[in-house]
Amino acid sequence: MGLTRNFILWILLSSLFTAIQLTSSQRNTPPPRSKDADLCNGVFVSYTYLTGTKIKPNDTKNQPYRFESEITVLNNGRDELKSWQVFVKFAHREILVSATNAVLSDGSSLPASVENGTIFAGFPSADLKTAIMTAGDVTQMEARVELVGTQFGVAPPSVPLPKNITLVNDGWSCPKPTQQGSNVLQVCCTPNPNITTSKIGQKFLPRQEGDLTIMYDVTRAYQSSYSAQVTIENHNLLGRLDNWDLSFMWMKDEFLFSTKGAYPSVVDSSDCITGPQAKYYKDLDFSNVMSCARRPHIIDLPLTKYNDTNVGRIPYCCRNGTILPRSMDPEKSKSVFQIEVYKMPPDLNISSITPPQSWQIKGNLNPDYKCGPPLRVSSSQFPDTSGLPSNKSAFASWQVVCNITQPTPPKCCVSFSSYFNDSVIPCKTCACGGCSSDRVARTCSTTSPALPLPYQALLIPFDNRTKLTNAWAVLKNRKVPDPLPCGDNCGVSINWHLATDYRGGWTARVTLFNWGDTDFVDWFTAVELRNAAPGFQKAYSFNGSIIAVNGKNTTVLMEGLPGLNYLLAEKDGKNPSEDFRIPGKQQSVISFTKKLTPGIKVGSKDGFPTKVLFNGQECSLPSVLPTSNSHRKHVSTFLLILTPFLALLFLRI
């Protein structure tokens, strides 16, 4: 009896073990490789949809579904594929929750919306070797990226395939992908014949060009730590950064032990104390550790710290986070700082160094930058510190390339005015956003066009303009919408005023207003005048010059003269309880000749800019231009006398 019972128990356990094995194998078995992969003599890329299920909440109009997919990148070519990158054009409002063996090249952390498509970069193994160099070892030739995420609207058994998948590495050409069955999208990419094979197959990738580059140079390496120098360099003609904030993500539990030339925005070692770092480094005083955050934020030091022997004394450091374009000052177009990094097991050898991923950089009222993954490049060269006429190579170097993207919405706006119209065309309604909430929509109109203003309203904060704006509308017989249009919500506004237009030339007046709480040091503005720029003569209170942008001499660059390079923040009036706040202001008249621009139509269009940038950030422009008042000659004098009295009357009601 006992023997029979033991036998039955053994049968049950064996069945359970077999079932577990089968279930495990069913879940983990990768999809079989396509036969087309063997026919591809380049890089074979495929996207395979594996499974999907309905998830909460239940919503017939906007139902979410979990999806699991796999990206395969197989190098069947003759040359090693360095730092592979694959673009996937998702099409169903996908939210990516996890991805193995890859990171998002734009630095986004998961979960992340990828509905507009995204680029995957290989990590931790970024390079795919060839069959020739590995004797056909597929594990070194191939990368498999397992994706888990959420998509909307495609219920099983339908398959939410992306619209496109392609290799984006330089030097490769990919045709339109083909669909195999219902769940596979694949493409075979081959070397671009216009690029030599030697360039593709070289040991390191060539340094790339971009609006902003970041070099991560390892200068000293030890078993459990290393030192690195980070160089941020601006290459854009009109781009800049103010109060730059640089962040990245450690991938293997590294932590920031010390810094020179920059500083973490938050000094905190608590994540190490509660994490594996304190268990391994038992004798380390973590009170001296700079940051244990997985994504530390690094900021520049103030000028006063440049000669500080503890945190400063680094060339190109300590400038309050200001990086100017080379067109303004080449010496101030880069920032440099140094860090000391502690590693964790199992990477405790000198050669095991993993650069941080997901780089992001931003500034205060500056262009938005999108950064790619760090790419291994040839080691940087540094002058020998001993003074000998030789260079010293970095232990290893990686380059991060960042490019400017046009944000939506912008952060500055422009108003237009002219000598032939007594009203100002103001900045657009909601020009800089801030109008999406229901509360805002209930208090003002987000769609009504901004009301024309009298000139003196430009000096008054938007919230205090209501009475003056209404009075001006009544005076000009304009209908006042209810509710009134929302404000522009911009931290900086620029007024372009067409001042004169005569036979031999014309003049304009540019006024910059700072409505924010931060001073702008070494500010600049760039104005594109497509037809009028060749006639530029002089900016009387600014330093002005013509610069070539994209090969065209159509842009006037203006910056503050020595001693006038500060655009101060908004401040209280003399009597804060009664007076309006006062914006920081800079103003100059600029003159043009018509000798080089015959036939120019100054008043109708050519005298107004087609693009305006402030500190590298493109500003919102009005949709209409000032027009000539046919009756203005009869009433202008009367209005000039009456307007101040109306303003005074309505502002004191």
UniProtKB/Swiss-Prot annotation:
Sites of GPI-anchor amidated asparagine lipidation: 629
Encoding gene, per UniProt annotation: COBL8
Alphabetic keyword roster: Cell membrane, Glycoprotein, GPI-anchor, Lipoprotein, Membrane, Signal
Entry's localization field: Cell membrane
Residues annotated as signal peptide: 1-25
Entry annotated with the keyword Zinc: no
InterPro entries: COB_C, COBRA_pln
Family membership noted in the UniProt record: Belongs to the COBRA family.
Main localization of the protein described in the UniProt heading: membrane
Pfam families to which the protein is assigned, alphabetical: COB_C, COBRA
Entry superkingdom: Eukaryota
Protein name per UniProt: COBRA-like protein 8
Membrane topology reported for the UniProt record: Lipid-anchor; GPI-anchor
Tissue and organ distribution: Expressed in roots, stems, leaves, flowers and siliques.
